[in-house]
Amino acid sequence: MPSFDVVSKVDLQEVDNVVNNVKKEVDTRYDFRGSNTELSFDKGGASISILASDDMKMRAVQEMLLANCVRRKVDPKFLDFGKVEAASKGMVKRSVAVKDGISKETAQKIVKKIKASKLKVQAAIQDDQVRVTGKKIDDLQDVIQLLRDDDFGVPLQFINMRS
């Protein structure tokens, strides 16, 4: 029986490249001279921490992160920006979580959407992915199109198409 998996995976190496590009840009930009703006990426915890001297520089770093994500073909929906918090010496910090995988709630929304479409397919939640099976590949392609048309708050990839 044909099937495919719906996943939401981020390439952490590309995110690391994005952070390194932003670091280089911060080092070379004139408006960041003399400011102690720092970026660090924790691959294990999949989070980016930003430390800037004021809110304006924090917003500029955020815009640079988003622009570099687009440039490196990393979907900006993977980044979950936390609140700006005060740090020592008048600095501000922000934590950015890198979302990886489909949450249980999102997976349930995906399954509900597929079942509401009345297509002859079955959807099952498996850890951080959704497996869709059906008798016809055309039905599976219709499901892919249906899911692409809707926004679930996370970027979706469709892998392991088997017939």
UniProtKB/Swiss-Prot annotation:
One Gene Ontology MF term: nucleotide binding
InterPro entries: DUF520, UPF0234-like_C, UPF0234_N, YajQ-like_sf
Membrane-spanning segments: none
Annotated GO CC locations: cytosol
Record Gene3D superfamilies: 3.30.70.860, YajQ-like, domain 2 (3.30.70.990)
Claim: Ubl conjugation is one of the keywords in the record: no
Pfam families per UniProt: DUF520 (PF04461)
Keyword Nucleotide-binding: yes
Keywords: Nucleotide-binding
Family: Belongs to the YajQ family.
Reported function: Nucleotide-binding protein.
UniProt protein name: Nucleotide-binding protein Dde_2479
Source organism (scientific name): Oleidesulfovibrio alaskensis (strain ATCC BAA-1058 / DSM 17464 / G20)
